Amino acid sequence: MNLKNYIFTHEMKVRDYECDLQGIVNNANYQHFMEHSRHELLDSLGVNFGKLHEDGIDAMVAKITIEYKIPLKSGDKFVVGINLERKGPKIIFYQDIYRLSDGKLCTKGIVETICVENGRLTRGEIFDEIFKDYL
């Protein structure tokens, strides 16, 4: 686990209610972890996701692919690493989740996002400015 390879990292801890009957994190919660980390990335850049919506700008997930490697369990501390790139009208987020206790890769995600401004699909140039240091 080399967290220096990511433009942003965010640490979290698994809560009991995020686990299923098998005692591991329910697969849907990995999407929540990734979404929260993307919002934290924006926040670290001085951008509030809710305020974007109020201003008529909505970043939306168009496609998500998640590869599950090993499960997280209740109480596990983990880190989400993020990289991103622009591909045409989409911003693609590459998000990896590592368990902090041993540095093992738990999940790899690719999240393709689009931008809708005032109800119309756009290229989302505002995100070029927001992510200018990373694109």
Predicted regions and their residues:
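Residues in well-ordered beta-strands of folded domains
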Residues: K13, E67, E112-I114
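Hot-dog-fold acyl-thioester-processing enzymes
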Residues: N2-M60, V116-L135
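HotDog/MaoC-like acyl-thioester-processing domains
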Residues: L3-K4, T9, K73-S74, L84-L135
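Hydrophobic beta-strand-centered segment that forms part of the acyl-chain substrate-binding groove
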Residues: L41-I92, K108
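Short, well-ordered turn and helix-capping elements at secondary-structure junctions
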Residues: D16-E18, I64-I70, S101
